[in-house]
Every structure is written in structure tokens, then in C-alpha cells.
Amino acid sequence: MASPSRQPPPGGSGLLHGSRARSYGSLVQSACSPVRERRLEHQLEPGDTLAGLALKYGVTMEQIKRANRLYTNDSIFLKKTLYIPILTEPRDLFNGLDSEEEKDGEEEVRPSNDEVWPHSTERKKQETGAGRANGEVFPTPGQETPTPIHDLSASDFLKKLDSQISLSKKAAAQKLKKGESGVPGEDAGLHLSSPRMQQRAVLGPVPLTRTSRTRTLRDQEDEIFKL
């Protein structure tokens, strides 16, 4: 007696009813997947390598090979452009649908200005009181803090240096003028006090070739040549 054919239960795992069975290792690109890739087109240059592109874009060499179906490092020069896979965050997948909810949550978390103002004023009063106790002076809100003097630009520094050099030159010239006007007469009286110095001043410097030592040496040489 033939047994009655069994009918598949509703919603079962049959071919027509229920979800479709998939084999091991099959890839499914689900719309709910938190990880998605966005591809950038990179124009290849003579010095480009897979390792350099991976470091530049923050991806692995295997991901670049998989996106462009490459097998070796030398095969990148067979193409003009390469696609670089870049991972996108899950927030970018919603296309701004949850942006309104996030904004509403931020508005609820943010305190109002009326609540923040008294706390800030109390904190400022405490800081000013502590500063006065320590002897420090805090500027008022309407009063601007003086700019530091030592912050000079390069041109200002060079101008200041030039002015200092000119002042030092003027001071040196004045000293030289004062020395020429008063000192020479006194020096002359001191140097010409001895008779020997007076003779030197009249006759001038005595050359070394006319000393007695040189005369005796010349006389000895003449006697040797005569012999």
C-alpha cells in the first residue's frame, strides 16, 4: 500500500517554502551588514607599488589585490588605474535617516544657558577670590591683557639691532674726538722729557743696520775676504 505523500510544513525548509539554503563558503552581501566598502580610483604612477599604496590608504595588499583581481606585484603596471577599497562606518549606511534622532538626543542632553550661567559665575568668583588671596591680579572681561614686549618680528629685531649699532658707533666717534683734542699734548710732554727721547724725535728712528754690532761684523768679514 503506497504511503501518502508527505506535504512540507508551512514555512519549512523546502525549495519553495522558507529560506533558501546556501552552500558553505558562499558570499552574501547583506543590506544589514555593518561593514561596507567604498572604492577609490587611484591613477597609477611609475613609482607606485602595492606596499606603498597599502600604507598610503591604510589597507592591506590582499584587499587591493582582491578588489582589482591581481595576482602578482608586477601586474599593477598593466592597468592605468587601481581601485582602493576603503571601509565605511555603519552610520554612513543610513544616509542621514538617524541624524534627526541623534540631534534630538543631543538637544535633550545639552543644558540650557540659564542653567550653565550661574555655575560659571560662581566658579569665576571663587577663582578671583583665590587669586586675590595669593596676590594675583586677574584682568576684567572688558580689559585686554597687555601683549608681551619680547614678541618681536624679524624686521623689528633687525631695526633694533641697527639702531644699537649706530648708537655704539656714535659713542665711539665721540670718544675718539675727545682723545684727539686733549691727550696728544700731555703725551708729547711725557715722551720728550728725557734727552734721548728728544734726540730720537729729531733724528728719527735709528736703523738696525747702523749699530755698532753690525759695524764690527762687517769689519770682520772684510778682513776675512782680504786674507
UniProtKB/Swiss-Prot annotation:
Biased composition (Basic and acidic residues): 108-127
UniProtKB keywords: Phosphoprotein
Residues annotated with Phosphoserine modification: S23, S33, S99, S166, S181, S194, S212
Region listing for Disordered, in residue ranges: 1-20, 95-150, 172-196
Compositionally biased spans, kind Acidic residues: 98-107
Matching InterPro entries: LYSM1-4, LysM_dom, LysM_dom_sf
Name of protein: LysM and putative peptidoglycan-binding domain-containing protein 1
Originating organism: Macaca fascicularis
UniProt gene name: LYSMD1
